[in-house]
Amino acid sequence: MRSVYCGVLTAANIGEEVTLCGWVDRRRDHGGVIFVDLRDRDGIVQVVFDPDAEDNFALADKVRPEYVLQVTGKVRARSESTVNANMATGEVEIYGTGLTILNTADTPPFQLDSFTSVGEDVRLRYRYLDLRRKEMQHNLRFRSKVTNAIRNYLDEHGFLDIETPILTRATPEGARDYLVPSRTHESKFFALPQSPQLFKQLLMVSGFDRYYQIAKCFRDEDLRADRQPEFTQIDIETSFMDEEQIMSVTEGMIRKLFNDVLSIDLGDFPRMPYSEAMEKYGSDKPDMRIPLEMVEIKDLMKDVEFKVFSAPANDPKSRVTAMRVPQGGEIPRKKIDAYTKFVSIYGAKGLAYIKVNDKDDLENGLQSPIVKFLPAEVCKAILERVGAENGDLIFFGADTTKVVTEALGALRCKLGEDLDLYTCEWAPLWVVDFPMFEETDEGGLTALHHPFTAPSCSPEDLQANPATALSRAYDMVLNGTELGGGSVRIHNQDMQQAVFKILGISPEEQREKFGFLLDALKFGAPPHGGLAFGLDRLIMLMTGADSIRDVIAFPKTQSAACLMTDAPGAVDAKQLQELHIRLRAKPQAAKDEAGKEEDK
């Protein structure tokens, strides 16, 4: 139906007869000449209809925005005064000699341009129209380009693209599963995979050596700006590689991707232990563009009379830290009060600070409500330890280790954004040496990553000191965003059972939920490991999109609903009967409580 795309025409095509298909972006009538901006996925070109071509002119007079047209005409140069430097096709136009209206269109509920502000609910309800917008066309074409580059890289490095099941069984991987009732197996359910984790490990046992998949994954969890109930993962697994080799291959992939697609050289990725990331930056995915660090001052506060600092300083489960903000003394008190409210979200009871007006005058040069409670020698030691200069602001955290780390870590990122402290555009990083386990609120242990991650010690040492064991895990971080996480896996049955035991999974539960994996580990499982990248998050970062929903064709809302299709939806009684399911009415008390939660 067409010979060329609208957006690719240039001066090199002048004189050619072309046939185009697309949508009417705009129609203008100037002095008896009709101009139609015709749009397709590659861009826009101007088509001119004049009264000499009577039939075409009359038809062109009827077209309206978003009509679908087929246009035949000759490419000609625009006059010098009408050249549009803002359009890729701005040097040329089409002199229309043929016109067919392929379809009409109702008036869209919003303008499909980059300048009109439209509520996201409206955009998602009419997603098929929203996707016609230039920004969305760019994002999805960019996504296709990225996945193609990733496939090419992995293919060149000997990886095989192998699909794994979507209908599987529930396994404890952290989030809630999406369950699918089985019609043929009464009272039993499939689960949609949270990741292809166990299947890709089994592929290594099967001898495929290098596997990858652009995989759909599903997690029934509360949503945020960077989360979706169904998301896409770049899933990778290898045999006979240690963590350094796996990190080298995957780092090479991301570096080549950024270089090929964005012409950006990320350089080598530095390594940082998890303990350092948490102590200095308050996050296991620190944004290294921000030149702010937490400095431990617990030892300086143990003997001060100010209980706000001395109490946590003498508590082994607490910490006292200081964070210097260069030239932060200009921050007004009203803004400091706002930051105090901000850290309270993370459990902080307050936000102490000192403004350094004159570091050499400890009596009069420090401005703060807390200075009067601190001896001069302590103030001097704090200034020296954080490297304070005149005009700086020092924030303090004093509470449990968890509260201080999370509160000042979040404040660090907020200050970086508010004060535009970024020192570079891109800051990649590997975070390594993660703890094997973390403590639950009930005092037990849970896997920091997942229960199939290999520890860096023997089964005996692991069982003797599980709380201090380190894992062979690694996370790739870029600009404070976790691009991907992975680990060397457990390939020995004894070690896997030892980990399950520490996690409180009984032998019976091990056999019920993971019997197939434990059996596979007995039949010559090779050393193996891998990594998974969040594709949606990666695209969001590379395009600069505000939300992950802007890089997915048909995303869900933050309440996990599709406004366009009205999913999830009710099903009829016959379908439920076939699945052996009966719905019970929610008790009125529960309905009332749910209503209260919605009101919040």
UniProtKB/Swiss-Prot annotation:
Residues 197-200 are annotated as: Aspartate. CDD domains: AspRS_core, EcAspRS_like_N. It catalyses: tRNA(Asx) + L-aspartate + ATP = L-aspartyl-tRNA(Asx) + AMP + diphosphate. L-aspartate binds at residues 173, 219, 449, 489. The keyword Lipid metabolism does not apply. This is Aspartate--tRNA(Asp/Asn) ligase. Keywords: Aminoacyl-tRNA synthetase, ATP-binding, Cytoplasm, Ligase, Nucleotide-binding, Protein biosynthesis. The lineage of its organism: Bacteria, Pseudomonadati, Pseudomonadota, Gammaproteobacteria, Cellvibrionales. The record marks 30 as: Important for tRNA non-discrimination. ATP binds at residues 219-221, 228, 482, 534-537. It comes from the Bacteria. GO terms for molecular function: aspartate-tRNA ligase activity; aspartate-tRNA(Asn) ligase activity; ATP binding; nucleic acid binding. Aspartyl-tRNA synthetase with relaxed tRNA specificity since it is able to aspartylate not only its cognate tRNA(Asp) but also tRNA(Asn). Reaction proceeds in two steps: L-aspartate is first activated by ATP to form Asp-AMP and then transferred to the acceptor end of tRNA(Asp/Asn). Belongs to the class-II aminoacyl-tRNA synthetase family. Type 1 subfamily. PROSITE patterns: AA_TRNA_LIGASE_II. HAMAP family: Asp_tRNA_synth_type1. It is an enzyme of class 6 (ligase). Homodimer. It holds the Pfam family GAD. One of its GO terms (cellular component) is cytoplasm. Its EC number is 6.1.1.23. It is found in: Cytoplasm. The keyword Nucleotide-binding applies. GO terms for biological process: aspartyl-tRNA aminoacylation.
